[in-house]
Curated annotation (Swiss-Prot):
InterPro entries: Homing_endonucl (IPR027434), Sporu_reg_WhiA_N_dom (IPR018478), Sporulation_regulator_WhiA (IPR003802), Sporulation_regulator_WhiA_C (IPR023054), WhiA_LAGLIDADG_dom (IPR039518). It holds the Pfam family WhiA_N. GO terms for molecular function: DNA binding. Belongs to the WhiA family. This is Probable cell division protein WhiA. Keywords: Cell cycle, Cell division, DNA-binding. Residues 275-309 bind DNA. Involved in cell division and chromosome segregation. The keyword Cell cycle applies. GO terms for biological process: cell division; regulation of sporulation.
Amino acid sequence: MSFASETKKELTQIEADNHCMKAEVSALIRMNGSLSFANKQLSLDVQTENAAIARRLYTIMKKLYPYNVELLVRKKMRLKKNNVYICRVREGARELLIDLEIISDDFQFNHTISRKLIKKNGQKRAYLRGAFLAGGSVNNPETSAYHLEIYSLYKEHGEALMDLMNEFELNAKTIERKKGFVTYLKEAEKISDFLNIVGAHQAMMKFEDVRILRDMRNSVNRIVNCETANLNKTIGAALRQVENIRFIENSIGLDQLPEKLREIARLRVEYQDVTLKELGEMVSSGTVSKSGVNHRLRKIDEIADALRRGEKIGG
């Protein structure tokens, strides 16, 4: 089961009061519902491929409304052969939709979120929960970039969803996609906050565990990469210095160098894998600082470069 499926399964098990259930079911119906007319009667179908969501929707609708609710199962023949679950309301469909402010008395559709249904904090959380159940997805934090999104068919609803999420300081954004609009979160911390807000506490804990491990792994990798780069730089410098010293030795002999340079040159050739600090501690006349050793080695590099250019070097 994917992380998104586990999250939705957890959300379908949350207990809520009637006000919160109404907010949740309004999101599910608004986003997954469709209307049809047959025999002069309006029929509402709410469709999902998730059995747990269908059961929850059916249970809530039966609890909140006196109308007959049918739960139908259809086989999806094309592509994925998942079952399709349909909650259907015939008699009372219009009254139910008016109560949820999805349509008005004169049958005008309202594509935004009814403020009446989200007066309190718990109702706002419930609406977001319903919206995620209806059209949400979240990437597996172990294998992908952090991303949570909720798909809306209408721009007004996508933007209303973004505004509602941002009441919880989630930094949500909305973008137009093919056949609709997506309200999304990209920051790991905000995704974790969203999971907590809608009540997916187990999913949030799993997400946080993975996030912490990933962040630690990334930090370790950065440190290792940095240390490797520094080590490669040090090794590269040492090899260049040894090459220059040997060039000088073959060209004019190390005896032509001043005594301080001659000693550091011989030490560098003999101890190629030690640091400049360690090299400075080997000087016979007394410890030379790291910067002092570096200065002498730079002088040796300059002499080697001068010899390559054919210049004469005095003793």
